[in-house]
């Protein structure tokens, strides 16, 4: 056992941690504080001098770059963050015990005791695992963007405008990401080591042999961040992917993941704010767009409140405040929050585009097509994430204008729709799902006498689960229903064409959603069922069938008809393949299935309890 004060003093019971570790953590907390007050460059400048020597400085520096990449989804930002995170990982490796936690704790022979790790070594383990986890997260950025994120003025080059690297650079990036994604699914060694290390560290924290050191809150916060992130992410994956991962040793428990992140968020540690951000992303994006729309909004507000009080002008927290108002259906309040977010900082200028994307949808919910068009136009001119998507949205909004409305800039929706396919970003043979959807919908405009899409803006609103937003406000729902009903009447009066059945079924789906939220349950069910009845007549929009089954199942679940709902969900999952936005639909089916099964189990337990009494 080492002597107190010696550099090899044992952790956690054998001696005093090195003061440099405590000092480094304090400095990194200061840097995060600068970051959260929109002083992005200052935070990086504060950290940079020690990034080559301190693993926490290096990790924090790389984490801020990764946050930038997550906000911008720009390939250059992703590469920059990835390279810096790799350097941080190498630095952590130098501070790790020669026999790592994963190797040591997993070995059945000559297993070292806990006391053989110094505090620096045990912190190096959690930092190393975090580097691996964050590098894995970067692999998801290109394909999972929510559509509003773009490249801001780069931290390292304030004059940099929105630009994307040339083709080869994009291809190399995508290939790198694709390989990392495959390695993640197949149990690639880096992600697997991160997962295993977090599992062992979690066991360590709960062990009766474990003694808390001076910097224990920061260490424990790191463990909770990693364990929570892994469990929560894995638990959300569709069953077919989850089975592959379980086969190679991964598993995820949603409740345990949420608990770990909530405990991490409530502590006072270097990782507390990261736990908060992950939870806010989960509550305001993942469960909303990829789930059933049932969001624990009270928990999101509880998480956000102390940070919004502490950082009233913090752009990140103002953005989440806007998202919460959107989900609550308070559209005017959401608009004010997003506008306030744009005013709060100018350094990451194009971070505003995240707000523009949200503002575009806010005005869509209100049926204010000119304002929606305005933000789609801004995005199409300033944003390099997906020109095809933004031009499609411009065309979609123009097509919603009335005959008497003046169309700005002399734009014509037919020409805009025709331009969409040429703007596709094809990277290593792959396209963004939203772009694929927009391109498929635009194809009908290539004929000399094109047949217009009935309500393209309202269709895309469904793709982003916007009906769960307007459903909170009957007035908004009535307004959208009126537009859909008029479109339905026009289809009935118009001549039959090759798109007639597809368009009629689309209108039925959207109408059913409005009726559901207005409490007209029977009418909603009839509309959803009519789509399945026309399944064999649909020529192009095959995504309508599984989504109609999904929406019908959700409607039945609200009536406690969970067994019927589960059968419909199983049919939607098993019987339909290769349709638009399939992965997103599968995520929603998975969330609905888990919810229905949970309700059935709770009902069974209640019956047993009643009988026992």
UniProtKB/Swiss-Prot annotation:
Assigned protein family: Belongs to the TTC39 family.
UniProt protein name: Tetratricopeptide repeat protein 39A
Pfam families for the chain: Iml2-TPR_39 (PF10300)
Segments crossing the lipid bilayer: none
Source organism superkingdom: Eukaryota
Organism: Homo sapiens (Human)
InterPro entries: Iml2/TPR_39 (IPR019412), TPR-like_helical_dom_sf (IPR011990), TPR_rpt (IPR019734)
Keywords associated with the record: Repeat, TPR repeat
